[in-house]
């Protein structure tokens, strides 16, 4: 379909980004991208099951808690808490065009199949993009080289049913919008919080929309 762009079907160039935004194209996950994502997820699940050593940020805590082992029944909670604890950006609300671009760039990055996420996680990002469900992201809080942790945490908090979003011009609770669409909050699996928060999609979008010529 001409009004749909398949994420993960090839390189995401400036020209393609402009076409997606200017022509208001919808996104869908390319079949080959689904295969890559699932293959990587299967590998990670197998690695966790078979490994006899701790895996940082996956079966251990973060930072100074790196020596704390996380039990298998707490792996999901660890990732959800990571997103919640880092959703602390402040300042002015970012324009919706920036928020939507962040979704686009992250969906593309995850479609490459190197991050260990679930297919449903990427699909929900695409769902938010296609239906103009815009999380509230603020303009202060990025760590720069370490990644846009706080802005990305604010971006993805609504995927797990927490925080507020703009939908149909109104600010409302994310969980109410999920209910309206019949979407279950994404149950993050091991490593997914890390995959969502590590990235430079916020900075990249600011650069892309800057007045400087490309």
Go through each PLM region and give its residues.
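Generic structural signal for well-ordered, non-membrane alpha-helical segments
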Residues: 10-14, 30-37, 41, 71, ...
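FAD-binding core of FAD-dependent oxidoreductases
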Residues: 56-70, 74-78, 85-110, 138-160, ...
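Signature of multi-pass transmembrane helix bundles
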Residues: 2-13, 185-200, 210
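Conserved small/polar residues in nucleotide/adenosyl-binding loops
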Residues: 208-214
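FAD-binding glycine-rich core of flavoenzymes that anchor FAD
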Residues: 114-140
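N- or domain-start disorder-to-order transition segments that initiate the globular core
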Residues: 2-50
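An acidic intrinsically disordered interaction segment
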Residues: 119, 166-175
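Generic secondary-structure signature for well-ordered alpha-helical cores
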Residues: 22, 26, 42, 49, ...
């Amino acid at each position: 379909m001409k009004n749909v762009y398949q994420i993960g079907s090839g390189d995401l160039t400036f020209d393609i980004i402009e076409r997606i935004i200017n022509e208001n194209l919808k996104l869908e996950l390319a079949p080959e991208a689904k295969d890559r994502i699932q293959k990587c997820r299967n590998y990670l699940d197998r690695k966790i099951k078979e490994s006899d050593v701790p895996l940082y940020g996956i079966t251990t805590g973060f930072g100074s808690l790196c020596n704390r082992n996380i039990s298998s029944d707490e792996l999901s909670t660890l990732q959800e808490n990571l997103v919640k604890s880092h959703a602390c950006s402040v300042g002015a609300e970012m324009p919706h065009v920036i928020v939507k671009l962040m979704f686009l760039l992250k969906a593309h990055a995850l479609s490459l199949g190197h991050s260990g996420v679930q297919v449903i996680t990427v699909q929900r990002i695409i769902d938010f993009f296609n239906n103009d469900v815009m999380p509230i992201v603020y303009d202060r809080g990025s760590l720069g080289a370490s990644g846009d942790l706080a802005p990305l945490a604010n971006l993805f908090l609504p995927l797990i049913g927490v925080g507020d979003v703009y939908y149909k011009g109104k600010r409302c609770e994310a969980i109410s919008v999920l209910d309206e669409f019949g979407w279950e909050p994404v149950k993050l699996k091991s490593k997914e919080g890390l995959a969502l928060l590590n990235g430079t999609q916020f900075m990249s979008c600011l650069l892309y929309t800057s007045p400087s010529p490309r």
